[in-house]
């Protein structure tokens, strides 16, 4: 990010922000409500266009690109509130995230390869939802939905993973498990 400024009708959400990341690097952005943390992620993912500045990923400018095209470049995001397919099972949610290429026909025909099934099983263990594999995602607790969405993001194998408040709304026990 180079000199990113975002102004909403005169309110400066971000003011001349600069940030660079290297492969494998982990960063946490901490601040009070309204400090611009989500706006910062929105700029990277194309949800918000900055008033000024540039965003580069893999040497390409992200400014003006559509959100889905930024995702295809390898940018994955988990939002504050869990966004899972509530009418699908936990397993089906994960099948969507690990299917490659992202083809509706692959999903309809259930063309999931053995290595993808192994990946789903691994992700289920990571999020401790193996016993809920056939449960509808809508029946999960808020915390379990958060975990499922994180697993879905991991299953996509993004080159850049943006996670916005992953423990928001979790109980103390769920936060400790996370």
Language-model features, listed with the residues they occupy:
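Glycine-rich phosphate-binding loops of nucleotide-dependent enzymes
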Residues: 1-178
């Amino acid at each position: 990010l180079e000199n990113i400024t975002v102004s909403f009708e005169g309110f400066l959400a971000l003011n001349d922000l600069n940030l660079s990341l290297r492969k494998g690097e982990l960063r946490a952005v901490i601040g009070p409500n309204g400090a611009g943390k989500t706006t910062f992620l929105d700029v990277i993912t194309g949800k918000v266009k900055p008033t000024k500045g540039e965003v580069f990923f893999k040497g390409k400018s992200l400014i003006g690109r559509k959100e889905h095209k930024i995702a295809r470049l390898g940018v994955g995001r988990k939002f504050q509130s869990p966004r899972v397919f509530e009418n699908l099972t936990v397993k089906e949610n994960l099948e969507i995230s690990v299917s490659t290429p992202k083809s509706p026909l692959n999903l309809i025909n259930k063309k999931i390869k053995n290595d993808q099934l192994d990946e789903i099983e691994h992700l289920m263990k990571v999020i401790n939802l193996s016993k809920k594999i056939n449960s509808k995602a809508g029946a999960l607790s808020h915390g379990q939905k958060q975990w499922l969405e994180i697993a879905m993001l991991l299953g996509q194998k993004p080159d850049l993973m943006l996670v916005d408040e992953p423990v928001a709304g979790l109980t103390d026990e769920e936060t400790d498990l996370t």
